[in-house]
């Protein structure tokens, strides 16, 4: 469970970024969903998953994580990575010498803009 959330953090968060749970939950939701209810549902699910991850990592209590939740998170990570690879492919085709750091920075910027739009629309909390 912790490895999956770490993979999401490394992909969707800037180094040293604060408010990881909120930022990660919002970015995953807007990256993977477009329907209002699905965005809200995934946002809430990711917040729960991040809380489970924190409890498991910091308190050594991973008993609250079910097999179903583990499979859900695995599928979310798979979907995020597929979307990211598609974004990378387009970026490399456009600029063959682009670096991972630039691609990541650009994608995070895109996601921040998407999150701002969704917050402005009242779909997610500020």
Where are these regions (language model features)?
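Amphipathic, oligomerization/interface secondary-structure segments
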Residues: 1-126
């Amino acid at each position: 469970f912790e490895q999956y959330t770490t993979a999401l953090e490394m992909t969707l968060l800037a180094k040293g970024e604060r408010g990881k749970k909120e930022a990660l939950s919002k970015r995953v939701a807007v990256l993977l969903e477009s329907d209002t209810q699905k965005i809200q549902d995934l946002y809430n699910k990711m917040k729960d998953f991040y809380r489970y991850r924190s409890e498991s990592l910091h308190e050594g209590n991973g008993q609250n994580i079910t097999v179903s939740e583990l499979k859900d998170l695995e599928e979310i990570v798979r979907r995020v990575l597929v979307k990211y690879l598609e974004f990378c492919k387009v970026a490399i085709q456009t600029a063959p010498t682009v670096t991972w750091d630039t691609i990541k920075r650009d994608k995070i910027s895109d996601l921040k803009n998407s999150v701002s739009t969704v917050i402005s629309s009242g779909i997610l909390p500020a």
